[in-house]
Amino acid sequence: MTQLITTIEEMRSIIANLHNQRRSVGFIPTMGALHDGHLKMMSLSLNENDVTIISIFVNPLQFGPNEDLDSYPRDIVGDTAKAESVGVDYIFHPTVKEMYPELPTIELKAGRLASVLEGAERPGHFDGVVTVVNKLFNIVRPHKAYFGKKDAQQLAIVEKMVEDFNHPIEIKGVDIVREDDGLAKSSRNIYLTKNERIEAVHLYKSLCLAQSLYKNGERNSEKIIKATRDYLTEHTSGTIETVAIYSYPELVEQTQIKDSIFISLAVKFSKARLIDNIIIEG
């Protein structure tokens, strides 16, 4: 049976016992509103570790002043049932006051990797991410931690943070889980209207177009980006905020593609801002 833990003290006590028993710990940090993408990460952890822990914490530090912190979906009962259905051992579900008794005096800065793409669109977002992830790593002390490739920039930043701060943690990037029509699973998909949901499938289709151009020999980023943007303009009513090609995981913008890249896009619908990407190995 999955145990719900709400305090740092209790979580640390459990972790100390697990480490004393030399049991391996897998960890999936989440903000709740669990979907099949989260469940895939949990299943991988269950296969690779003795104990699997997830956190459910809507971190206020990573939301901007006009973002959806207050309306972000929260359903701890439903989330617990989903986690229990796959066999998760512990859910760490602290309150904001438990995690931040007062505003943090010291916050981490994600640096150059956060100055592009989502970081440029959402200033301070990745600073909040690395601050809370670093804090969670210090509490849970996992051997492996799992992050979805849908947030590829976040994955690259967390990997760099672990390297820079010498966390003894293996970071595992998990492939995007998609709906049958290709839309990436996301907690924010529930915000889409019926028509927007129909249009949203074209985010993935536009990425497939970009990938096809690459596979057919196109290496000029500007041409791939234009074709992708033109496709999105024709097939969606959303505002196209980003279509970009960067090296991965270095996150350096590419004009002429040479090595591994990721093609990233963001489209803003009426109440949902969706992101998606494809990573292409060089």
From Swiss-Prot:
This is Pantothenate synthetase. Homodimer. PANTHER family: CYTIDYLATE KINASE/PANTOATE-BETA-ALANINE LIGASE, PANTOATE--BETA-ALANINE LIGASE. ATP binds at residues 31-38, 148-151, 177, 185-188. Keywords: ATP-binding, Cytoplasm, Ligase, Nucleotide-binding, Pantothenate biosynthesis. The keyword Ligase applies. It is found in: Cytoplasm. InterPro entries: Pantoate_ligase (IPR003721), Pantoate_ligase_C (IPR042176), Rossmann-like_a/b/a_fold (IPR014729). (R)-pantoate binds at Q62, Q154. It catalyses: (R)-pantoate + beta-alanine + ATP = (R)-pantothenate + AMP + diphosphate + H(+). Belongs to the pantothenate synthetase family. The reaction proceeds by a bi uni uni bi ping pong mechanism. It comes from Staphylococcus saprophyticus subsp. saprophyticus (strain ATCC 15305 / DSM 20229 / NCIMB 8711 / NCTC 7292 / S-41). Its EC number is 6.3.2.1. Beta-alanine binds at Q62. Pathway: Cofactor biosynthesis; (R)-pantothenate biosynthesis; (R)-pantothenate from (R)-pantoate and beta-alanine: step 1/1. One of its GO terms (biological process) is pantothenate biosynthetic process. The active site is at H38. GO terms for cellular component: cytosol. Its main location: cytoplasm. Catalyzes the condensation of pantoate with beta-alanine in an ATP-dependent reaction via a pantoyl-adenylate intermediate. The lineage of its organism: Bacteria, Bacillati, Bacillota, Bacilli, Bacillales. It is an enzyme of class 6 (ligase).
